[in-house]
Amino acid sequence: MYILATAVCLLGFASAQKVTKLTSCLTKEKNLRMDCEYELTAATPVPTCTYTQENNVVGSTDPAKSQDPTFKNRGAVAIMEGISTCRLNLTGFSDDKPKNFTCTIKQKETVSKTSTVEKKLLLQCSAWSEHGSMLMLTVTSLVLLLEAKWL
């Protein structure tokens, strides 16, 4: 009985909708780019994504959300096809003080994650920053497979 209850609880947590990672970097043009990676519980309905800064909407894929005038024509949000990532591109990102940005994903549930962004501490966006962990995992796996073959 306890095993069944534990299994049900663990499966429930394993399939929960969540934001797994929120990263930020500076583009070559010195604009802010944020990637919000998420996991969904179902393929439908299509999720919406909203980025806010201090309760002001920076950008959203939800047509019901009005963009704050401060970010009009500066903030663009898009859900990246096939990789469960919502991307914010913000032009004219000032470097006066750290700012809190929140990514909110809404599908069946609403989940969010907040990150403090300080321009002077941001790294340059690159292919390595996007795919570095995947590349490292691939190389490590390849080395382990080659070692296993020779044992």
Functional labels for PLM-detected ranges:
Residues 69-97, 107-109:
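Extracellular beta-strand/loop-rich beta-sandwich domains predominantly from IgSF
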